[in-house]
Amino acid sequence: MTATHRGAQADASAPAGPLPPEAAAKRVAWLRDELDRHNYQYYVLDAPTIPDAEYDALFSELQALELEHPELQTPDSPTQRVGGEPLSAFDSVRHRVPMLSLNNGFADDDVLNFDRRCAQGLGRTAPAAGEQDLFSAADAVEYACELKFDGLAMSLRYEDGRLVQAATRGDGETGEDVTVNVRTIKAIPLKLRGQAPAVLEVRGEVFMYRGDFDKLNERQAEAGEKTFVNPRNAAAGSLRQLDPRITAKRPLSFFAYGLGELQGVDRPPTHSAMLDGFAALGLPVCKDRAVVKGAQGLLDFYRDIGQRRDALPYDIDGVVYKVNALAEQERLGFVSRAPRFALAHKFPAQEMTTIVEDIEVQVGRTGAITPVARLKPVFVGGVTVTNATLHNEDEIRRKDVHIGDTVIVRRAGDVIPEVVAVVTERRPDDARAFVMPTACPVCGSHIEKLEDEAIARCTGGLICAAQRKQALLHFAQRRAMDIEGLGDKLVEQLVDQGIVRTPADLFKLGVAKLAALERMADKSAANLVAAIDASRETTMNRFIFALGIRHVGEATAKDLARHFGKLDALMAADEAALLEVNDVGPVVAQSIAHFFAEPHNVEVIEQLRAAGVHWTESEPVAKAPAPLSGKTFVLTGTLPTMSREDAKELLEAAGAKVAGSVSKKTDYVVAGAEAGSKLDKAEALGVPVLDEAGMLALLAEAGAAPAQE
């Protein structure tokens, strides 16, 4: 529960020495209330007010007092989350109000038809088939929209505000009693806040944040234990542990989204009001929700969430629409085992099963040998996937991937498809294990694997045509020399026909030679020659990045250019001198020194200079503390006078880190026009928000001048 500031800490200091029973009872009550309050601030408000160490001290004090005064221990105490003795089996629980599944929709027409059915069921004039938005604002049905979490459905029963039972969905009528395990989940309150109903059944989802899932798998791997395929499997497996002490160690979370049995108070008028009520009682409720009208409102919500899906910190597989008014939900009722008033609008699946037809290896720019699974085509993540990376030989062995296996393939957003697990029970008798080749499939050079590296590499260097092709593509990319028009197919022809062997050869190309190549004509050849000619004027950091030195990315290239000022100074630097550069460690320093010690590389650089490649050099900048070092910024929206990339360069030049998402660790958000959810989250977390002028003023105050290329 990391925080950047402390809240009010009345009575926070632990008393010295043993307490008499009456004082102990008061102290225990205060500690429980204080720990419950901090859990609420952390899990519901997402705004913690004390650091982890202080929370742990309060928790330890409560544990000690309950041990000293066992008569004060109660089932809803925060100390009771640690888990008790293992169970032999889970008991069955019959749901008083069934936990029904939802009908699914996959296309826009499914949503239009759902809206039409709801309107007709409520006696409103519905649009004709294939049409939408024919309602007046008064006629359109109001819906509550929320996320469809990819976790495990759960029912929590509270009596007089205290958690008495937790059960899985099961078949909807009967589930399993997992109360002892659920009590270990810190996000779920053991006691509700405020005036709680006599009976409240809360429906929601137990899930795992992606970051927590990654850390769990790291711990599992370090301990030599089985890792989990995805967060959903991890959440389900953790919750169904017979030993609650294991569950207590798993980073499970929870969001409330529905209502079961309710006694002692009236039902709220709307679904959205119900969720607000849950939050007031201390239950975690997802903030990514909206109330909309009509089919167009539903589709707009779906598309907005779809665009932000990969940036969310947890997995979802769609969105859920519910008629907002609970009275209207009752009027619409149910059909079979699903409510008429709700629809789950699914996203394209991000995981599917298919068959590994072969495993081949690809050779990268630095000689890295990467095994790639050739797959039976499968539609996943919105595209047809035929290949998936297997990363390296160790990863193949760890996942036990064989040719012929049925595997689970995952593709999320722009992420390269990967094989995440093997369905071993479907392995055919003729499945074959992968054997890493000892010679490069492109040039025949020896493949070596160093002891401290997972990746095997071709030793051929630029003798290897595959490495030459990748090196040329890297050299020409937009963020390097920016040679527009030099793509994969053209580079392949230039290398295969022996026209280009090094980047310097690009500057010898003429229109006639290029026009003779496949898919090239005089105009496109002339355009490419012009682009190559324009690239002669560049910047030192772009040139360094274009060289393709292993471990040297854009940020390191900028640091090197800024530190040395002149290329000759960089080329002459030994490892000790390189270690003086910001963020350059021993591995990177060794890689740079080895690159410039290779005569062939120096020869290519001199050929490039002779071809007219040039930049403005400057005096070296002594290493100094970066004024914004340690600060994390997030950029969102459109800035008035510069691109976000320009703003990022300014901030990074001042030592700041620029992140892609807002969290409690973010120091500033720089927001321009049409800033989206990042701005909302910053305001919710209390992160300072700057406009472009504010960012520039902060840079000026810190003495950080704009980076010079």
From Swiss-Prot:
NAD(+) binds at D52, A53, E54, Y55, D56, S101, L102, E146, R169, E205, K322, K346. Keywords: DNA damage, DNA repair, DNA replication, Ligase, Magnesium, Manganese, Metal-binding, NAD, Zinc. Zn(2+) binds at C440, C443, C458, C464. It comes from the Bacteria. It catalyses: NAD(+) + (deoxyribonucleotide)n-3'-hydroxyl + 5'-phospho-(deoxyribonucleotide)m = (deoxyribonucleotide)n+m + AMP + beta-nicotinamide D-nucleotide. One of its GO terms (molecular function) is DNA ligase (NAD+) activity. Residues 1-20 are annotated as: Disordered. The keyword Glycoprotein does not apply. One of its GO terms (cellular component) is cytosol. GO terms for biological process: DNA repair; DNA replication. The active site is at K148. Residues 623-709 form the BRCT domain. Belongs to the NAD-dependent DNA ligase family. LigA subfamily. DNA ligase that catalyzes the formation of phosphodiester linkages between 5'-phosphoryl and 3'-hydroxyl groups in double-stranded DNA using NAD as a coenzyme and as the energy source for the reaction. It is essential for DNA replication and repair of damaged DNA. This is DNA ligase. It comes from Cupriavidus necator (strain ATCC 17699 / DSM 428 / KCTC 22496 / NCIMB 10442 / H16 / Stanier 337) (Ralstonia eutropha).
